[in-house]
């Protein structure tokens, strides 16, 4: 951080910039860095020169893959910005950055409006209760419609937009914005790349609309703020300060979302958006105490106030490998103060760690810091055992902060090294990448011995394989993408009795267990284990072994060897032998009892369903719908948007491979689509038979 940076909590903002792919998010961040004086040359995404997109693949693909954290100063406030990816395959990046942010700027495309990934990200932000302002970008583009975008925020996001700016002109005539708080026009100058703008009176032909929208603004804010409601009912006009204060209170309470507009690419509207970040988004003090729990008791609540006088606590939200300094762990400090070289406790794993260096990150260059206090986001070097979602804290005042939830992968491929020399490197690369990305999973196929990598989509795995090649020099052959099917059960089976016995001279093995198995009604990741054994029929030290055996059996289902999910095991009874019983014997008994029970419990196959949205010209509508139906798709909605037709459907992932090429040829390249994981559902009988036969090699 620059040495003159204000460090007080009240003047700190930790924000994310979130949006759909291509809404102009990275360009917006670049402009922020330019106007706050961090960059001297503006980087353009389509030239591959954006500061935030610093990985090679991002510069080639023009999309943001990892959320880089950058610090800048505006109006004597420190703004820590996390640039998040908008592509659905990288949802994990958005999820983890929202957990550590205090506020966010949602960037929308004025032409496309609220797109599917915008909805996903908005709902993620709702879940973490992150206050947001909205920036309607690309106002200079043909087909830009500000008001339709605002309407879509209401319809699709269930938001309460408080419009504080109107566009001045539209498309190629877009010149600036009309500020409804100050009732002034703002015009940008092109000669200094939009670094300065003129404040002018609102032109006559815009005055009526401005007055009408200002009245709407006052009404929206008053409806969500008691203080302004009183003024409103008395017919009094609030002062600029009162209106700003009401907007801030409403935004912090997540009741309203101030909406601004502009064109980041054309350098218009970025500074007022930065003003809105400072004026309306929360500082760490507004967010208040972070709630965690005691290390010894999950139900015992522990509070950590955002103050440097409190004991140190922080959350590790991202791991990255840096070619120069090694493993970087990004942390958000919630309380206390951290200095370089100090010992900390990783309370999640109960391991002591030592902080080496503390680094303030600017997209891809870094600055050493001696220490860092509550409310800041930095990267630290020297942590050996810390992974995403772990809590770091003062060893004398342990606490575990709320972690993050990550979706399970939906697609997997087999990967093998091209040469013997690549074998070792592949292992290292996979281990490092799995450390960085919790949604990237690795396992070995027991039958074929192949290494299987799994992720959130084809692009996700492409990028990971690409990184193996570039960063670790691994040349690998990658198989065809396979769908991550799962299995579950449909009915309860009771008192399944299994005895594991092996008594052939010497010490034998003996364990008997009796279990119930039933569906747990979860949504894809559920497993419950309940122990109802009484009277010491199975000694207490063997109970975890039965649980472990059941969990091991779940990894390979009874139908086709896919993981079994959403089950509850109840251990009812059993027997042990003084000499021959062991942890291993009970683990095997648990595993075999589970498999027996699963076979009897009406097992079924589950497949991932994707929410697909296709944008197509009207004359290709029939072809698109026919094609989706042929892929076992269920059409859920159709609507018109700016001369195009939108088809929303739910389609099994297994039917979507190669869809991009088929859609192109059916619509002469005029249609586009986006898809994201929706849910798991039962595979129809005839299709399931084929999948099971294939998995069994029949």
Swiss-Prot record:
GO terms for biological process: ribosome disassembly. GO terms for cellular component: cytoplasm. The keyword Cytoplasm applies. It is found in: Cytoplasm. The keyword Protein biosynthesis applies. PROSITE patterns: G_TR_1 (PS00301), G_TR_2 (PS51722). Its main location: cytoplasm. GTP binds at residues 19-26, 83-87, 137-140. GO terms for molecular function: GTP binding; GTPase activity; translation elongation factor activity. Pfam families: EF-G_D2, EFG_C, EFG_III, EFG_IV, GTP_EFTU. Keywords: Cytoplasm, Elongation factor, GTP-binding, Nucleotide-binding, Protein biosynthesis. Residues 10-285 form the tr-type G domain. Catalyzes the GTP-dependent ribosomal translocation step during translation elongation. During this step, the ribosome changes from the pre-translocational (PRE) to the post-translocational (POST) state as the newly formed A-site-bound peptidyl-tRNA and P-site-bound deacylated tRNA move to the P and E sites, respectively. Catalyzes the coordinated movement of the two tRNA molecules, the mRNA and conformational changes in the ribosome. Belongs to the TRAFAC class translation factor GTPase superfamily. Classic translation factor GTPase family. EF-G/EF-2 subfamily. PANTHER family: RIBOSOME-RELEASING FACTOR 2, MITOCHONDRIAL, TRANSLATION ELONGATION FACTOR G-RELATED. This is Elongation factor G. It comes from Frankia alni (strain DSM 45986 / CECT 9034 / ACN14a).
């Amino acid at each position: 951080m620059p040495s003159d940076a204000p460090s007080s909590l009240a003047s700190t903002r930790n924000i994310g910039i979130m949006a759909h792919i291509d809404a102009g998010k990275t360009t917006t961040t670049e402009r922020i860095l330019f106007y706050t004086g961090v960059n001297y040359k503006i980087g353009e995404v389509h030239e591959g020169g954006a500061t935030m997109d610093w990985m090679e693949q991002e510069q080639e693909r023009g999309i943001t893959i990892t959320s880089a954290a950058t610090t800048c100063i505006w109006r004597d406030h420190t703004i820590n910005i996390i640039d998040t990816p908008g592509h659905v395959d990288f949802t994990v990046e958005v999820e983890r950055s929202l957990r550590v942010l205090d506020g966010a700027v949602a960037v929308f495309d004025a032409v496309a409006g609220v797109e599917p990934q915008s909805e996903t990200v908005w709902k993620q932000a709702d879940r973490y209760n992150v206050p947001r302002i909205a920036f309607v970008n690309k106002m200079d583009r043909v087909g830009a419609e500000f008001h339709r975008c605002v309407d879509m925020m209401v319809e699709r996001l269930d938001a309460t937009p408080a419009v504080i700016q109107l566009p001045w002109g539209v498309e190629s005539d877009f010149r600036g914005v009309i500020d409804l708080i100050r009732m002034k026009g703002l015009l940008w100058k092109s000669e200094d790349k939009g670094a300065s703008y003129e404040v002018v009176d609102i032109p006559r032909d815009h005055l009526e609309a401005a007055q009408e929208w200002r009245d709407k603004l006052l009404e929206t804010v008053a409806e969500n703020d008691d203080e302004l409601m009183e003024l409103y009912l008395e017919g009094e006009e609030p002062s600029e300060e009162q209106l700003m204060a009401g907007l801030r209170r409403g935004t912090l309470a997540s009741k309203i979302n101030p909406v601004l507009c502009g064109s980041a690419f054309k350098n218009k509207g970025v500074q007022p958006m930065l003003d809105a970040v400072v004026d309306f988004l929360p500082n760490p003090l507004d967010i208040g105490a972070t709630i965690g729990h005691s290390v010894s008791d999950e139900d015992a609540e522990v509070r950590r106030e955002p103050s440097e006088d409190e004991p140190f606590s922080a959350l590790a939200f991202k791991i990255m490998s840096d070619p120069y300094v090694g493993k970087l762990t990004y942390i958000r400090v919630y309380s206390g103060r951290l200095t370089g070289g100090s010992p900390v406790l990783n309370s999640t794993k109960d391991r002591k760690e030592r902080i080496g260096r503390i680094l303030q990150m600017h997209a891809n260059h870094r600055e050493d810091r001696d220490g860092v206090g509550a409310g800041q986001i930095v990267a630290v070097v020297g942590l050996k055992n810390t992974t995403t979602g772990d809590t770091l804290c003062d060893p004398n005042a342990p606490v575990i902060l709320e972690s993050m939830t990550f979706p399970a992968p939906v697609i997997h491929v087999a990967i093998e090294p091209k040469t013997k020399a690549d074998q070792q490197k592949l292992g290292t690369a996979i281990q490092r990448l799995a450390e960085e990305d919790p949604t990237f999973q690795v396992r070995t196929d027991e039958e074929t011995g192949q290494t299987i990598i799994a992720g959130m989509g084809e692009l996700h795995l492409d990028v990971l394989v690409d990184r193996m090649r570039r960063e670790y020099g691994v040349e690998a052959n990658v198989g065809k993408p396979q769908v991550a099917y799962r299995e579950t059960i449909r009915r309860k089976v009771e008192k399944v009795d299994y005895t594991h016995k092996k008594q052939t001279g010497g010490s034998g093995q003996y364990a008997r267990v009796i279990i119930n198995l039933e569906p747990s009604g979860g949504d894809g990741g559920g497993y419950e284990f309940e122990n109802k054994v009484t009277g010491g029929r199975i000694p207490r030290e063997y109970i975890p072994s039965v649980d472990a055996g059941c969990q091991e059996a779940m990894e390979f289902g009874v139908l086709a060897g896919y993981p079994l999910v959403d089950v509850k095991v109840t251990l009812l009874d059993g027997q042990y032998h003084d000499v021959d019983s062991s942890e291993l014997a009970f683990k095997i008994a648990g595993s075999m009892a589970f498999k027996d029970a699963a076979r009897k419990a009406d097992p079924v196959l589950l497949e991932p369903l994707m929410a697909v949205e296709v944008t197509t010209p009207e004359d290709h509508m029939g072809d698109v719908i026919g094609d989706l139906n042929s892929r076992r798709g269920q059409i859920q909605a159709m609507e018109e948007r700016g001369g195009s037709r939108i088809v929303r459907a739910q389609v099994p992932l297994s039917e979507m491979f190669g869809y991009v090429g088929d859609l192109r040829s059916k619509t002469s390249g005029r249609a586009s689509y986006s898809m994201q994981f929706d849910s798991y559902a039962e595979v129809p009988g005839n299709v399931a038979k084929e999948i099971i036969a294939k998995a069994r090699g029949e």
